[in-house]
Amino acid sequence: MNAKTYEALETMQKRLFQIQKDLEDENILKDIKKFTELNKEKANLEEVVEKFVEYKKAVDHIKDAKAILENEKDSELIELAKIELDENNDKVEHLQQVIEEMLLPKDPNDEKNVIIEIRGAAGGDEANIFAGDLLRMYKLYAETQNWKINILEASLGEAGGYSQVVFMIKGDRVYSKLKFESGAHRVQRVPKTEAKGRIQTSTATVAVLPEMSEVEIEIRSNDLRIDTYRASGAGGQHVNTTDSAVRITHLPTGIVVTSQDGRSQHDNKDIAMTMLRAKVYEAEVEKQQAQADATRKNAVGTGARSEKIRTYNYPQNRVTDHRVGLTLNKLDQVMEGNIDEFIIALINEEQRQKVAEQLKNNE
């Protein structure tokens, strides 16, 4: 382990000790905000410090074993020292790798809830139907994670599915698992409307946005145009006699969001503002990426809505993720929400890229 990393870990260990002392202070116990902040910092430090303590113990055992090998003449003790040395050398190597991975830059949004927007793209009715299939897939996956899902806005397709659907998923580390779903999802299958049984290729796009708080994304009221109108059901039929639906336009970016499924105009405005903050954040990130180098440092793919990320081939019961080259011959299970294999492969690829970048920076 290099000296800079070791020094940083020593600082973390001292900081954790100080936090533990502070959390016993009566004044801090009374200050809910400070208490919460310290507990969060403590949680972020505990695991890496625990591994560092294990690492230091293993290093001490190596020193002791070497001392025995240098000075001891008893063959039995020498043999035991050799075993101890081998075991702890392996342990140090493993712990160093674990610690270095834990110290890699973390995505600050990984802990957040998400807003997902699915749109039927190329392929007309079939694209809309597939957008509905993807929504169902994410709903089923959310159930396995004990996450809560809430539809924010939906436009039904004429033949089924959705031309657009926006929904929120709340739970533990949702963004960390679903952020790689952004992009174009391509489906190859025979549409129900196809009389001759020909395979058609259609596309639905997915955008996964972290939920942003008012503090993180500040939107000035004078940058908004807010229009109200009557909420309507399928076919444009009025289902509400009051102007409860809300359309908000963010004037600096031209972003428009609408909400009509809330119980009141106030609810719809809150929902629309939640969607707007996420979309303004997305626009800002895209702007920064456009200004950055062509080779992005932290991405498995670009995350752009237009980037083809996955193909779902129904006739062959096959799904391929093009970013990691992973093919699963169990499309039926994937569409039932079993997407963990893709998620794990993508997380591992992101980790691999971060390690490679870190090594490059250390050269």
UniProtKB/Swiss-Prot annotation:
Q: Where in the cell is it found?
A: Cytoplasm
| InterPro entries associated with the record | PCRF, Pep_chain_release_fac_I, Pep_chain_release_fac_I_sf, Prokaryotic/Mito_RF, RF-1
The alphabetized UniProt keywords are:
Cytoplasm, Methylation, Protein biosynthesis
Q: Care to name a GO molecular-function term for this sequence?
A: translation release factor activity, codon specific
SMART domains, sorted = PCRF
Q: Which residues carry this modification: N5-methylglutamine?
A: 237
Is Cytoplasm a UniProt keyword of this protein? yes
Q: Which Pfam families match?
A: PCRF (PF03462), RF-1 (PF00472)
Q: What is its main location?
A: cytoplasm
Example GO CC term: the record gives: cytoplasm
Changes after translation: Methylated by PrmC. Methylation increases the termination efficiency of RF1.
SUPFAM superfamilies in alphabetical order? Release factor (SSF75620)
Q: Into which family does the record put it?
A: Belongs to the prokaryotic/mitochondrial release factor family.
What the protein does comes down to: Peptide chain release factor 1 directs the termination of translation in response to the peptide chain termination codons UAG and UAA.
Descriptive protein name:
Peptide chain release factor 1
The taxonomic lineage of its organism, from the top, reads: Bacteria, Bacillati, Mycoplasmatota, Mollicutes, Mycoplasmataceae
Q: Which gene encodes it?
A: prfA
